[in-house]
Amino acid sequence: MEPTAPTGQARAAATKLSEAVGAALQEPQRQRRLVLVIVCVALLLDNMLYMVIVPIVPDYIAHMRGGSESPTLISEVWEPTLPPPTLANASAYLANTSASPTAAGSARSILRPRYPTESEDVKIGVLFASKAILQLLVNPLSGPFIDRMSYDVPLLIGLGVMFASTVMFAFAEDYATFFAARSLQGLGSAFADTSGIAMIADKYPEEPERSRALGVALAFISFGSLVAPPFGGILYEFAGKRVPFLVLAAVSLFDALLLLAVAKPFSAAARARANLPVGTPIHRLMLDPYIAVVAGALTTCNIPLAFLEPTIATWMKHTMAASEWEMGMVWLPAFVPHVLGVYLTVRLAARYPHLQWLYGALGLAVIGVSSCVVPACRSFAPLVVSLCGLCFGIALVDTALLPTLAFLVDVRHVSVYGSVYAIADISYSVAYALGPIVAGHIVHSLGFEQLSLGMGLANLLYAPVLLLLRNVGLLTRSRSERDVLLDEPPQGLYDAVRLREVQGKDGGEPCSPPGPFDGCEDDYNYYSRS
């Protein structure tokens, strides 16, 4: 019986420690910050996994074509391997080019690089697009699921699916497995990305905190896209194919465990929190003209980036005889203006929150001008400046319009954010599903100059459309969520409640001014007008 006393004391001490840690984690402000960290890590992982395969998969598929699991060793003449591309520079591998490295240097042993054939370029393009395609298909279902289940459980599901996808990438040995892993990542992203952004909007209901938190999330997305190709290329070169994926899988598992500790998604309190008001169906949100304008802007602003990624390297080689390091480094400086754009928009939104539409329109104009200038660049430095302008404009649009979506749901619908951010994810996925597959064909049929000018013109023409959002900042939460629920036909005792609500409104309650879509009042009767 003597050993039981120390055991009981240890158990009691562990219980007290667990309770103390749990109480600290449940403190509202601290929990909100931890949730932001968890979501940012999830977004970082998703974008790192999206880009980490850029220097790995094309080379590995070429090795499989050669009939060997590992690159061939040569001892007399060495050929330099491609430097790992940066940010979204998948073009060094996706472009239809048969560039061969130049023999140089002293005699030493090194891995011989292999390059995809033209047919493999098509397979790699489909592989890169498969993630966005599945994400595009799943988001109309994941949004309502998130609205019904709250945000923590779908985020946990997304992290679990991303963990499985990453492990599958690590042990993949053929194209079919790579394709399945990439598609599985799209399934995980449809849950993790949408629920993560929606959770931030829910935890930070007031401005400017909401814009600031979403800006931090966008910075992590950009950083993940930037750091993933060199991270994957270096580890692939020195540690093998599996190591970068296993590292990302470990971080994904840690993030999921941290979410379990902080949010406790399966506890009784979490089940009580899950009793959210019934959200507006996603098809009705899609028909809301304000939300449609924002979704169109998000798609339009991302098309130049998605279409330039797989084509710009070949154009650089043919136009300015760019070296391999220039093609690999061309996107690297763009991270700085992207973060600067996020910071600037957050600061401006804090001071002038009613001008979010103007920041988005300015971003579209900057994207349009930058895209039109790209074909005129004949050297490396001007091209870098143009791409920096492109990413700066994208930061303005994303940082201004993502909080606007949450605000529109607050004032025109029910404050449940899963479906509206599923629409935002659909907007991004449209661009990135088409880019790797369509961009090369457009360049071959029309030319790179026509592609860039067309995308720039589309952004310039769409910028004035955001004028339709100019009155959004003047809308107020003139009706509560309870009032929205009472729009349904009353039953039983609720007749009296509805009667009192109607009588209260006859007293001259202040109303919000109408927007340019006041003709849609009958369909979206969620705010009053004088």
UniProtKB/Swiss-Prot annotation:
CDD domains: MFS_SLC18A3_VAChT. Residues 504-530 are annotated as: Disordered. Expressed in the spinal cord, brain (excluding the cerebellum), brain stem and cholinergic tissues. Not expressed in peripheral tissues such as liver and kidney. Disruption phenotype: Mutant mice die shortly after birth. Embryos at 18.5 dpc. show abnormal neuromuscular junction morphology characterized by increased number of motor neuron and presynaptic nerve termini and muscle fiber necrosis. It is found in: Cytoplasmic vesicle, Secretory vesicle, Synaptic vesicle membrane. Coiled coil: none annotated. GO terms for biological process: acetylcholine uptake; neurotransmitter loading into synaptic vesicle; positive regulation of acetylcholine secretion, neurotransmission; positive regulation of long-term synaptic potentiation; positive regulation of neuromuscular junction development. It is a multi-pass membrane protein. Pfam families: MFS_1 (PF07690). One of its GO terms (molecular function) is acetylcholine:proton antiporter activity. Gene3D superfamilies: MFS general substrate transporter like domains (1.20.1250.20). Residues 55-125, 174-182, 235-242, 310-325, 378-388, 444-447 are lumenal, vesicle. It comes from the Eukaryota. Residues 1-33, 147-152, 204-213, 264-288, 347-356, 410-422, 469-530 are cytoplasmic. Its main location: membrane. One of its GO terms (cellular component) is cytoplasm. PANTHER family: GH10249P, VESICULAR ACETYLCHOLINE TRANSPORTER. Belongs to the major facilitator superfamily. Vesicular transporter family. Interacts with SEC14L1. Electrogenic antiporter that exchanges one cholinergic neurotransmitter, acetylcholine or choline, with two intravesicular protons across the membrane of synaptic vesicles. Uses the electrochemical proton gradient established by the V-type proton-pump ATPase to store neurotransmitters inside the vesicles prior to their release via exocytosis. Determines cholinergic vesicular quantal size at presynaptic nerve terminals in developing neuro-muscular junctions with an impact on motor neuron differentiation and innervation pattern. This is Vesicular acetylcholine transporter. It comes from Mus musculus.
